[in-house]
Amino acid sequence: MIFNEYEEFCKKMDECIEKYKGKFGCIVTFNGFVREYDLKDGEKVPSKGMKIDEDILEKLKLVIEEAKNKFDVIDILFYHNTGFLSIGERIASIAVFARHRKEGFEALEYIINEMKKYH
């Protein structure tokens, strides 16, 4: 499930914890923020922020479905901010509910790597 409002993501996290109680062994999470610099050719270059188009949300829905099909996980929640993001702003939050940490971490790594293709 994908969200473009962080508060909705947090609310759904709480709901899923109750819904899946006893079924999951871990929730593997990731939170990404805009850095004050970018790396270009190994050099630190000051950042002015980043712009994220709303069409990324549709692409990320597909990534989530792919991850659910590829890895043995219970559920995936994904928040992604859009518009112009300033330094320090949250870009994305991901929560993978899994029976075991191995599958949870593998699914999370896959999602992050796919997400980075669109940034």
From Swiss-Prot:
Pfam families reported for this sequence: MoaE
A GO term from the CC aspect: cytosol
Highest taxon of the lineage: Archaea
InterPro entries cross-referenced by the UniProt entry: MoaE_sf, Mopterin_biosynth_MoaE
GO biological process: Mo-molybdopterin cofactor biosynthetic process
Entry's family note: To Synechocystis PCC 6803 slr0903.
Protein name per its UniProtKB record: Uncharacterized protein MJ0717
